[in-house]
Amino acid sequence: IDTVIHNATHMNHSAPYQFLKPTNVDATQALLELCTQQKLKQFHFISTIDVLNNACSADEATDIFALAHDPSNGYVASKWVGEMMTLNARHFGVPTTIHRLGLVSSDKYGYFEPNQWLIKLLYSCQHMGAYIQDHSVDVALTYVDETANTIAGLATRNLAGGTYHLCTSKQFNMMDVFKHHTSQMTPLSLEQWLAQITQNDDTTNGITSLITDLLQ
């Protein structure tokens, strides 16, 4: 083994840090230890752009050490801890690289991960026949196959030691999506939409708490 690419994660934006720590933090520690055994191995840690806390002026060189993360958002907090561990290992000579992903969508052929929050939101709106008219979200998507190819390319070029943002600045507004389907969907206020989806949460993949956190 020459290279370890650590993309395994438990992605749950509603779970607290302690719930996600065994999978997202302890596993990272174990893989970093693996990279020091017998011979040094390159370690590529797949993180999230959200560790920057939406800082507008942040870039790959931004020091995230002082950025606070609420333990209630366990996913982002666990990725922040993972980055700190990866940087610490780099300090001790392990060739590490950090890849921060934005919102990764389907591949170019349309296959998508059904548990992703955006897919759940769109599915829920379609299932209910209603969308939220007084709240909107700007979304920037990257294709999963393009993202994977970029990571593989960086890993094979032996560019250890860097931090890379694998995301796009091109955004679209969710309201633009809904406008194309207004004849089939009813516009509701956030309160009305949440009340209706709560009644249907068994068939809308338990998205209520996630969307509440996202839009409120």
Please describe what each predicted stretch is.
Residues 25-31, 78-86, 121:
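Conserved catalytic Lys-bearing alpha helix of Rossmann-like short-chain dehydrogenase/reductases
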Residues 1-26:
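NAD(P)H-binding glycine-rich loop region in Rossmannoid oxidoreductase-like domains
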Residues 10-12, 49-56, 102-105:
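Active-site segment of SDR-like NAD(P)-dependent oxidoreductases
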Residues 150-215:
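Mid/C-terminal beta-alpha module of Rossmann-like enzyme folds, strongest
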Residues 57, 87-140, 144-153, 157:
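NAD(P)-dependent short-chain dehydrogenase/reductase
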Residues 6, 22, 26-74:
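Conserved Rossmann-fold NAD(P)-dependent oxidoreductase catalytic core, especially the SDR/UDP-sugar
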Residues 21-22, 71-80, 115, 137-141:
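Short-chain dehydrogenase/reductase
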Residues 14-20, 54-58, 110:
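Conserved catalytic-core motifs of eukaryotic protein kinase domains, centered on the activation segment
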